[in-house]
UniProtKB/Swiss-Prot annotation:
LRR repeats: 98-119, 121-143, 144-166, 167-187, 189-210, 212-234, 235-255, 257-278, 283-304
GO biological process, one term: negative regulation of T cell migration
Domain Calponin-homology (CH): 576-692
Gene name tied to this protein: LRCH1
The protein's name: Leucine-rich repeat and calponin homology domain-containing protein 1
Annotated positions of the Phosphothreonine modification: 568
Organism: Homo sapiens
Lineage, broadest ranks: Eukaryota, Metazoa, Chordata, Craniata, Vertebrata
Length: 728
């Protein structure tokens, strides 16, 4: 049912057609137009009368006709009659208990009339544009009410009793609501909720219980945060424009059924304004990218024991007859296509290596987490049993006794190195690893936030995604002992047939030896000696077809000490400290020159090129004619504008005389290569310090020359004047 002059109510016409009898609807429609026109009918005269006085007779005529029509049709229309209360005088003469629709909009009611609360068949109630401040609890009697319009009133709160109605549409816009009741979650059938133009500061969490809600309008309120519970709703339209929302939660990307999203006039920071202006698709794409970045960052900090077990990958490898060594998925792996006598068992050996490697890594990670040094021996007690149980008879056990002793000694050496690694990893005891951002707040393991951030950055550096990935076991070793790809894995040219030999950590070699011993029943002692790194290098030449054994875990004994993971970690930490000092020096240089305080994140301050352009303009004015600067509406420049600023800065540096050797590239600035940026800035500042004296000297020379020419001209004029005077 459309109301005269009211706001658009999309739900009313549908209910009007469904609830009113078709024979009564045209008559009601005609009556509606009479009121809208305001002429010709007694109802129109009544609409212009007051509640008392000389207009009682026209008012009573209009009310009588409206009430009589309501009793016959079930639709009560008392709109725009300036009523301050329900007309009680005429009501007893008519039976309105079966009223289905009631329109009391555009009146002067200060509360919902109690008479309406007795219309138990009422389905649609329109109280638009009144002065209502109170809603009686008796409204809970309207258990057939599905549409309620309370817009443009003076309500300061919605009563909890209102949430006990079977409402499908609730419109309470243009009121003074400060909040929504927590009982709003009881409106299970609510499909449309409009609380726009109010004073709501926060939405209750119970709003996520409105499973039938399809349209939510919270426009022009004081919302700062959008509750994540909105994701649980199947919203089709969501309007939160003209609020104070700063961030759209990342989880909103899961609102798959959302078709209309209105968010203008919000000080949004995430997503940025240039993304929001492009529409819902770009906003959701931005949120998805942010979610992927968060998931990727979180996966880097997972503990070794929390990561997926290796046997899951091993099972996948068995299905396609690939041990993980010979796979070529684009990374630098060893090729396993060369023919050899081992081909019949080439699949079993790497599988056993991987399974044994997983067990050793788990036990070693448990040891590194344990504060008690004595637990190290308990963790590795099962290993000698592997050597003993692998032989099926006493003779085979005797054959491998000497070799087992050698392996045990190597294993003890490995254990000692692991203990040294544990000692080195205690950053608070190593003065070389302490940087300005890594400090201990107390001796009771209360670590400073800066230390945690530095450690996370260290993990990012050490777990380089561009590194070599040889197989599943080697990735687990890199997780156990984080090393950079360039230092942890070395590809050396082997003197034997030009083959490539892969350098791995000492863990790989020990595990290879243990695995070969545990599977000794499948090999002869000679085969084991050929695959053992303890044998002389000449034994490698006895491999079939002159090729090296395909085990990726083998390497010469001479390189055991050449790759030290502790040294690699130390070097990474030193590089981090040097880079931090470099950034601070660069910050001081720019701040001293510009006399401003830069943002805490220097990389973000330099990447857009604005600061650099101001720096070169400070050294020589108007070197960069136009600079793209962020605005409050667009707080971040696009990549094209950032690159244009950077290119203008570099071009100005060339004009000032910065050598090409000292000039960084645009990619260095956009990718925050502080070493090259520092070199360019230092050269620029040095030229700036040398430039003023020649400039001032040049200006003085020009001034002196101008004065001399002026004096000479005056002298010539004087001589000419006197010469003419004498000759005359």
């Amino acid at each position: 049912m459309a109301t005269p002059g009211s706001e658009p109510q999309p739900f009313v016409p549908a209910l009007s057609v469904a609830t009113l009898h078709p024979l009564h609807h045209p008559h009601h429609h005609h009556h509606h137009h009479q009121h809208h026109g305001g002429t010709g009918a007694p109802g129109g005269a009544g609409g212009g009368g007051g509640g008392s006085g000389g207009f009682n007779l026209p008012l009573n005529r209009g009310l009588e006709r409206a009430l009589e029509e309501a009793a016959n049709s079930g639709g009560l229309n008392l709109s725009a009659r300036k009523l301050k209360e329900f007309p009680r005088t005429a009501a007893p003469g008519h039976d309105l208990s079966d009223t289905v629709q009631a329109d009391l909009s555009k009146n002067r009611l200060v509360e919902v009339p109690m008479e309406l609360c007795h219309f138990v068949s009422l389905e649609i109630l329109n109280l638009y544009h009144n002065c209502i401040r109170v809603i009686p609890e008796a409204i809970v009697n309207l258990q057939m009410l599905t549409y309620l319009n309370l817009s443009r009133n003076q309500l300061s709160a919605l009563p909890a009793c209102l949430c006990g109605l079977p409402l499908k549409v609730l419109i309470a816009s243009n009121n003074k609501l400060g909040s929504l009741p927590e009982e709003i979650g009881q409106l299970k059938q609510l499909m449309e909720l409009d609380v726009s133009c109010n004073e709501i500061t926060a939405l209750p969490q119970q709003i996520g219980q409105l499973k039938s809600l399809r349209e939510l309008n919270v426009r022009r309120n004081y919302l700062k945060v959008l509750p994540q519970e909105l994701v649980d709703l199947s919203l089709v339209k969501f309007d939160f424009s003209c609020n104070k929302v700063l961030v759209i939660p990342i989880c909103f990307r899961e609102m798959k059924q959302l078709q209309v999203l209105l968010l203008e006039n919000n000080p949004l920071q995430s997503p940025p304004a240039q993304i929001c202006t492009k529409g819902k698709v770009h906003i959701f794409k931005y949120l998805s990218i942010q979610a992927c970045q968060i998931k990727t960052a979180d996966s880097l900090y997972l503990h070794t024991m929390e990561r997926p077990h290796l046997h899951q990958h091993v099972e996948d490898g068995k299905k396609d007859s690939d041990s993980g060594v010979g796979s070529d998925n684009g990374d630098k792996r060893l090729s396993a296509t060369e023919p050899s006598d081992e081909d019949t068992v080439s699949l079993n050996v790497p599988m056993s290596n991987i399974m044994e490697e997983e067990q050793i890594i788990k036990e070693d990670s448990c040891h590194r987490l344990s504060p008690v040094k004595g637990e190290f021996h308990q963790e590795f007690q099962p290993e000698p049993s592997l050597l003993g149980d692998s032989t099926n008879s006493g003779e085979e056990r005797d054959q491998f006794t000497d070799r087992a002793d050698g392996l045990h000694s190597e294993f003890m050496n490995y254990k000692a190195r692991a203990e040294d690694c544990e000692e080195l990893l205690r950053i608070e005891e190593d003065v070389h690893w302490q940087t300005e951002g890594i400090i201990s707040s107390s001796k009771d393991q209360d670590m400073d936030i800066a230390m945690i951030e530095q450690l996370r950055e260290a993990v990012d550096l050490l777990q380089d995604p561009n590194g070599l990935s040889t197989d599943i076991t080697e990735r687990s070793v890199l997780n156990l002992y984080p090393m950079g790809s360039a230092e942890a894995l070395e590809l050396q040219d082997s003197a034997l047939n030009g083959q490539i030999q892969l350098e791995t950590s000492p863990v790989c070699e020990v595990q290879s030896d243990l695995t070969l011993q545990s599977n000794g029943s499948q090999y002869s002692p000679n085969e084991i000696r050929e695959n053992s790194p303890a044998v002389s290098p000449t034994t490698n030449s006895t491999a079939p077809f002159g090729l090296k054994p395909r085990s990726v875990f083998l390497r010469p004994q001479r390189n055991l000490e050449s790759i030290d993971p502790q040294f690699t970690i130390r070097r990474k930490m030193e590089q981090m400290r040097e880079e931090k000092e470099l950034v601070e020096q660069l910050r001081e240089s720019i701040e001293m020159r510009l006399k401003v305080s830069l943002h805490e994140d220097l990389g973000a301050a330099l990447m857009d090129g604005v600061v650099l352009c101001h720096l070169v303009n400070h050294i020589r004015p108007r070197s960069v004619a136009s600079i793209h600067v962020p605005s409050p509406a667009v707080p971040k420049l696009s990549m094209a504008k950032c690159r244009r600023n950077v290119e203008n800065f570099l071009e100005a540096c060339r004009k000032l005389g910065v050598p090409e050797a000292d000039l960084c590239s645009p990619c260095d600035i956009l990718q925050l290569d502080f070493r090259h940026i520092r070199k360019t800035v230092d050269t620029l500042l040095a030229l700036g310090e040398k430039a003023p004296p020649p400039t001032s000297a040049l200006r003085s020379r020009d001034l002196i020359g101008f004065c001399l020419v002026h004096i000479l001209f005056i002298v010539l004029v004087y001589i000419t004047y006197h010469w003419n005077a004498l000759s005359a």
